[in-house]
Every structure is written in structure tokens, then in C-alpha cells.
Amino acid sequence: MLKKRVEEALNAQINAEIWSAHFFLAISLHFAENGYPGFAARMKYQHQEEHRHALRLMDYVIEQGGKVELQDIMDIPSDFGDPVESFEQVLVHLMRITD
């Protein structure tokens, strides 16, 4: 059984991974819609990686007898600008999540 504090921390990380996955999916769609299929594919890969992280953590929480608490996904950007501006947003996001 997980300690409450550990379960809460894992749930926070799960939700952060899910938010990150949606961020990368949104930017992948932005690139696809604007004629950058290579960039779109790379961001889709990042989406899948973040999603896998969330799933692994969910499995762990459940295996340990904990409860996964999913939160609403909010405030995903929708305006990414040109490719340089888009990758600047990716850089800011990556710096925030790896801090």
C-alpha cells in the first residue's frame, strides 16, 4: 500500500505527463495542419512517449494498491506560431517539466 503523500505525488506526476502528452499532440497537429510533416511526426512521437510515462505510473499506482486520480486537462495552447516560435514553446515546456 502506498503512503498517502507518495500516492499524491505520483498522481501529480501522472497528471503532468498527461498534460505534457496533450501539449505535444496539439503542437503535432499544428505542424501537420501547416505543412510540416516531419516536425509533426516528431511531436507525435513525443506525445506517445509522455503518454507511455503516464500509463507506466498508473500501472504502478494500481499495482501498489493505490488510486489514480485524473484531473481535467486545461490550458493547452492552441496558437503556436511559426516553426521557430513553436519550438521556443517546446523548449520552455521541456525546461519546466525537467526542472
Task: Label the model's feature ranges.
Residues 1-99:
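Iron-associated oxidoreductase/ferritin-like identity signal
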